[in-house]
Every structure is written in C-alpha cells, then in structure tokens.
Amino acid sequence: MPTTTVKSTDLDFDNIKASLKNFLKADTQFADYDFDASGLNNILDVLAYNTHVNGLTANFALNEAFLNTAQLRSSVVSHAETLGYEVRSRVASKALVELSVNLSGVTGRPAQIQLNSGTQFTTSVDGVSYTFRTLETFFARDNGSGLYQLQTNEGSSDIPIFEGTEKTKTFLVGETSERQVFVIPDTEIDTKTATVLVFDTASSTNFIQYTPLAEASTIDKDTTVFTIRETPNGFYELNFGDGISFGKKPDAGNKVVVTYLATKGPDANLADTFTATSNITIAGANYSITAVTSAESTGGALRQSIESVRQLAPLAFATQQRMVTSADYKAVIMSNFSAVTDTAVWSGDQNIPVDYGKVYISLNFPTGTAESTKTETQNNIVSNFTDTLGIMSIETEFVDPVDIFLELVVNFDFDPSLTGFTLTSTENSIYNFITTFFNRNLNTFDKIFRRSNLLTEIDALDPAILSSRCETK
C-alpha cells in the first residue's frame, strides 16, 4: 500500500496534480507507469481540476459565511441585517430654496396660498438636466403687500426639494397565512422617500398611512409600521408586521400603494439654479413661482458600498441606538448622513486643552459643499441624534477640519524603448495616478501619507518607468 498522503490544504492546481502523481507512484502496482504519458496525464488533469474546483467552491462558500470575508453584496447585506443594521439605498440629492409668489396688485387675493407636494423644479449639472420636487405641502401668508413667502411647518423659509422621478407600485394582499413578499423592482429607489398607503379594498378611497419602523416609539400588534430591505438581486422588499406582536399586518384584499423617488444619486449634486416647471393656480389664474437658492444640492449618493457596510454594521450594532463612545458617534453619523464623507470624534478629556463635559465632532464634506448645507447637517445631528441618543450632560461642539496640503515633486527615469507611450503621456499618467492615489488613500481623517507606497505604485504603472523619486514640501 502507498505511504504517501495527499495534502488536502494545498489547493493550487499544479500542487494537487503533483501530490496525486506522487501518491500513485508510491503504490507498487503503478511502479512502471509513465504518469506523463497522454492518457494518465489527462486523467490526472481531470482529477486535479475537480479537486481544485471543489476546494475553491468550499473556500468561497465558507468566506461568504462571515461579514469580514464575504465578497458578494447579497452576503454582506444579509450579515448586516442579522446585526440589525439598515443598509442604505440610493439617496436623493437635496437642495434648499426660498419660494415666493407675487400677487401684488391682484384684487381679492387670498390670505393664504398652498404649494402642493410634487411641485417640480428643473436644473442642470454639467449639461445634464435633472428634476427636483417637493415631498410635502407648504403654505404662505400674505405679507400685506401681496408677496407670499412659502414656509415649512417650523417657520423656515428654506424649502427642501429632492431630485428624482416619482414612481408608484401597487400590490394586492392575497389570501394566505404565510408571510407575503412585496418586491419593488427598482434599484434606484431612495427608501427614505417612500410612503406606504394601505387601502381597504382595490377600489376603496379609505386608507391608513404606515410609517417607517425607525420612527415608531412603541410596537404592538396594531402599530402600522413598515420596513424596506434590499433583496439579493438588488431590488427592494416591502415588509409589514406579523399581526401578532410586532406591527399590524395588512388584511387579505387590502391594496398597498408605495410611492417613492427613483434618483440619480450623486450626479445631481452641486446644482445651484432651479426653475419651477409649473405655475401656481389661484382663483383660476396662473402665477409664477420664484425660486432663490439657499443651499445648492448635496447629499445625493449611490447605495451604500460593500466596504462601508462591512465597516459600519458592527459599529452600529455596538451602539445599540445610543451615543456614548466616540465609535458610537461615528457609526450613527456615517450611517445617517450621506453628505458626510468622514467623521472624527473625540471626548473633552482628549482635547487640547482638556474640556470636560463635551464631545467634539469634526465633519469632512465633499469639495464644494455649501456652508449652509454644513450648518444644516450639524443642526440635524444635534436635534435628531445627540440630543435624543446622547448623554444629557454632554455638550456637542463641532470643529472645522484643518486641510493639510502636500506639494510633491516627482522625478522618474524613463526608457522609451520599453513602451509605446511618449514621455509626455507617461507624465500625464503619473500625474493622474497621483491624484487618484490621494483621493483613494488620504482624503479622510487618521490617514498617513507613505511616500514608499506611492513610489511603488508609480514604478508599476509602466515597464518604461525604471525608477522614481519624490520630494514633499
């Protein structure tokens, strides 16, 4: 009998084949066989290939079982859900505008006018047109001279408008005791803009508006809440309660209507001029709506990346909906504010000078973000999160980040005989790569510039680059 064993941990094809060959050679029954002959060689190839594929399949499957090694988006999203983390969908770009209607000189003008939800505004970014719209109804009162300045419920004249196309999906609840799945076949949905209405029947006008689970203060069998989760194929699934202890379940025969925005995400950011596409009708006459931009559009984002989910899901689970440690603050902010690219948080005892009873937050925004947007984000963090989830005696203070700029002088040795590119095109390639390197590795907090890493990647750009040197200032 042979004494040689096959190494089960060696998954490389050539090593598997060599191991099988050595295993068979050790058996006296195959002492005179030529294992490099075409017949036996083909058989060994098949055996090695089969073992190689099976080993890789088992390895891949095991990797997908853990959040930190999973590569498929569906696996990462599934693991995040087990931690109670809501993976962010696309986010519609948001702008603030001051809207007014001038009725001066109009006799019998009303004391109050109304701007309906869904009023559209057009704009363009880099030559591409986008449509923004209101998501709620706003009112304005006559200031005495016929000017109507629209305001929010809080009394602010900054009206939020959001980019996207309004879409509606209708479902009929069937006769079944099993959990029904309501799939929204749209990868561009901004789930935060979704509204869910449940009608008594397909033809009824009576409805109940369900609210997102995150907005519910208490949950019982009669609480009308819904959730929207990402499915393995990239679409989104609408879910309701079980009707027993965790939220109300729609009855058989009910009609479910979901309205939401399908958005282009970051493409519509940095728009600063908006024009109303329609007039407002008052007493049968049409009047134009004047829009003055208070804050350019920002915050639009693609759906959350795999690496972002991998990083934030465990942190969000650790926070347990409270803000105590610096990691809690970072997890909550990064999970809820797509306009923020990075966050640094430290306590008062870590500050210089020491300042007990405070938590310091520094927010990093994309280049070009308006100051009004930064201020609004800070106010939202305080009012919606630190005041409700933080410790009462801890005061929040925001600190502007300090940008550090590096001036690089890069020299390289170039051999034109080793490439088809010219010296000028190679210089441009290196310049573009350096920009990409900084954007990828350094435009966030707690990052270190390592010159050796930069030079190593520059040398690998083209065989004609024999060596490179870098001076920093």
Give the residues covered by each predicted segment.
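Acidic, glycine-rich low-complexity/disordered segments
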Residues: 144-204, 237-238, 246-323, 389-448
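Carbohydrate-recognition loop of C-type lectin domains
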Residues: 4-7, 12-20, 24, 320-441, ...
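Short, well-structured beta-strand/strand-turn elements
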Residues: 122-134, 206-207, 331-351, 461-473
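C-terminal structured "cap/appendage" subdomains that terminate the fold
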Residues: 433-473
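Extended assembly-interface regions of large multimeric machines
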Residues: 1-190, 455, 463-473
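Extracellular/luminal ectodomains and secreted, surface-exposed scaffolds of diverse proteins
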Residues: 193-248
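Flexible glycine-/small-residue-rich
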Residues: 99-103, 200, 240, 260, ...
